[in-house]
C-alpha cells in the first residue's frame, strides 16, 4: 500500500511536534525529557483517525531526516500495536518509496529485525522520565496494517469533526476494547 505521509518529526530529533487538526498547523508539543531521539521519521495520515483521537501515525524508514510538514511517498509494510495512556495508538511502519536503496523492502518480512527492535525500544522507553508507561502489543504485517488504515479512514470520515476528547469519550463507550487501563 502506497501512501503520502505528512512528516511531523524528523529522524534523530528530540522535539515532539503535534499536528492540530483544527488549526491545520504543526506545533511543538514538548521536548523529550531524556536523551532519546526519534529513530526514524515520524508522520501521520490526515485522512485517517486513530482511537487516541489523533491522525494515524506512520514511521517512515529512510536515510534522510525530513522536515515537519513535508509529504513523503511511502510504502506501508506493517504496524506496531501500542497502548499509550490506555488508548490504542497504532504506528504504521513504512519505507520511503522514492529511494532506490529501499526498493528491495516490499513487505513486513523484509524489515530488518534491528529496525523493529529500535522502534520497540524507543516507544517503550521514551516517556520513562515523565513516569508514563507505554505498552507494545506486538507487530503486524502489511495486510493487518491495510485493514487498520481502512478502519481509521472510516473513523475520520464519520468522526473527524469531533474534538479529540469528545471522540475518545464516544469511542470508549462504543469500542471499549481499544482502551486498556
Curated annotation (Swiss-Prot):
GO terms for cellular component: cytoplasm. It is found in: Cytoplasm. It is an enzyme of class 3 (hydrolase). The keyword Hydrolase applies. GO terms for biological process: phosphate-containing compound metabolic process. Its cofactor is Mg(2+). InterPro entries: Pyrophosphatase, Pyrophosphatase_sf. It comes from the Bacteria. It catalyses: diphosphate + H2O = 2 phosphate + H(+). Substrate binds at residues 16, 30, 42, 126. CDD domains: pyrophosphatase. Its main location: cytoplasm. Mg(2+) 1 binds at residues 52, 57, 89. PROSITE patterns: PPASE. Keywords: Cytoplasm, Hydrolase, Magnesium, Metal-binding. Pfam families: Pyrophosphatase. Its EC number is 3.6.1.1. Mg(2+) 2 binds at residue 57. GO terms for molecular function: inorganic diphosphate phosphatase activity; magnesium ion binding. Catalyzes the hydrolysis of inorganic pyrophosphate (PPi) forming two phosphate ions. Homohexamer. Belongs to the PPase family. This is Inorganic pyrophosphatase.
Amino acid at each position: 500500500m502506497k501512501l503520502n505521509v505528512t512528516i511531523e518529526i524528523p529522524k534523530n530529533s528530540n522535539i515532539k511536534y503535534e499536528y492540530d487538526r483544527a488549526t491545520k498547523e504543526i506545533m511543538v508539543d514538548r521536548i523529550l525529557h531524556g536523551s532519546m531521539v526519534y529513530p526514524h521519521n515520524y508522520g501521520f495520515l490526515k485522512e485517517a483517525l486513530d482511537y487516541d483521537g489523533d491522525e494515524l501515525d506512520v514511521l517512515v524508514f529512510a536515510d534522510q531526516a525530513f522536515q515537519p510538514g513535508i509529504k513523503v511517498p511511502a510504502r506501508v509494510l506493517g504496524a506496531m500495536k501500542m497502548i499509550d495512556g490506555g488508548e490504542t495508538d497504532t504506528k504504521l511502519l513504512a519505507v520511503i518509496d522514492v529511494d532506490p536503496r529501499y526498493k528491495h523492502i516490499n513487505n513486513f518480512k523484509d524489515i530488518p529485525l534491528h529496525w523493529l527492535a529500535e522502534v520497540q525500544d524507543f516507544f517503550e522507553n521514551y516517556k520513562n522520565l515523565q513516569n508514563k508507561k507505554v505498552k507494545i502489543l506486538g507487530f503486524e504485517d502489511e495486510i493487518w496494517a491495510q485493514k487498520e488504515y481502512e478502519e481509521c479512514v472510516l473513523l475520520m470520515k464519520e468522526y473527524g469533526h469531533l474534538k479529540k476528547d469528545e471522540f475518545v469519550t464516544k469511542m470508549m463507550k462504543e469500542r471499549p476494547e481499544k482502551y486498556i487501563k
